[in-house]
């Protein structure tokens, strides 16, 4: 009986997954790699700063290391090997992320922290690049294009869960090392579950060869503008996404919001995907992308221009309610503009995004050390998001 159940389970792993299974698997992957793997740094960071493990400047360097890993991982993700074996690199990236989280529990060391975050960023890039083959493209081929944005909601759920976990541990007097280990266990458990949930994708018979110049997307003016816009978006969102909880902790009147500020971002992010998908259907995907950038610019500016409990809540809703939707919609536009090489286009977009993310936290951490506040870097980020939205309008005219 037991043998029959095992045989049935193994057989199910080789069957084409249902659209619901693809969407749920994609959500778990994004929750593990990004909601926890990337963004748990935000609620743990103030605890590390208070304990003397990091300063605002060194925190920016460590954050930038994660995004450097993401950038280099995205470049590596454009290789023929990842296109031939997407599941191997997908699962490997998830496991690398979990191990890197555990490594953050090491004794305080900027080089060690930077290496761990680099490894996590490198792995997460493989996850999002290979997600196209593992879940997004199969959903499109199954005629369920409406579900192709669902995996990105996993980031919001992961943020909300990890933020809640950190708050519970903090209220129990647990230190930052245990916070990292607890989140590492959750992230790794999700990765192991995905081993059974998502089988290797089957490429359609008409799929182009993964290697060679035929697989390279043509860089049209519209795609070039989108890539630049996406890089500015990466720079614009990441400063607030990295330091929001630190901004809240530094303002005495906002102290009661610290356990909730990042959870608000996560919940808004989880709910943002259906809303912005609806906006895209009622208008166009490019309009939704540009409008999202402008809404996010408002949220980023509100976090520092008038930091009251009300504006911080609005800022969290605007940030969380846009950044994953913009990510998903931007990648969808790129896939549409380069239909013959979607995974390579996704790698190019991810690289531009990663470059913007490297500059953002390093600049913000340095400016915080010299000026004593996050006001100037946050306003620069808001301006970058306005330009990103304007470039989105150019994409609409050029395509």
Report each predicted region and the residues it spans.
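Helix-breaking motifs and short loop linkers at transmembrane-helix boundaries and internal kinks
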Residues: 53, 85, 106-111, 305-307
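Extracytoplasmic gate region of multi-pass secondary transporters
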Residues: 42, 222-263, 267
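Helix-to-loop junctions at the C-terminal end of transmembrane segments
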Residues: 73-85, 272-284, 368-369
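Helix-loop-helix hairpin linking two adjacent transmembrane segments in secondary transporters
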Residues: 110, 143, 147-199
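Primarily marks hydrophobic transmembrane alpha-helices of the MFS/SLC 12-helix fold
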Residues: 87-90, 289
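C-terminal transmembrane helical hairpin of 12-TM major facilitator-type secondary transporters
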Residues: 283-330
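A late C-terminal transmembrane helix in Major Facilitator Superfamily
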Residues: 337-373, 381
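Cytoplasmic helix-loop-helix junction between adjacent transmembrane helices
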Residues: 116-154
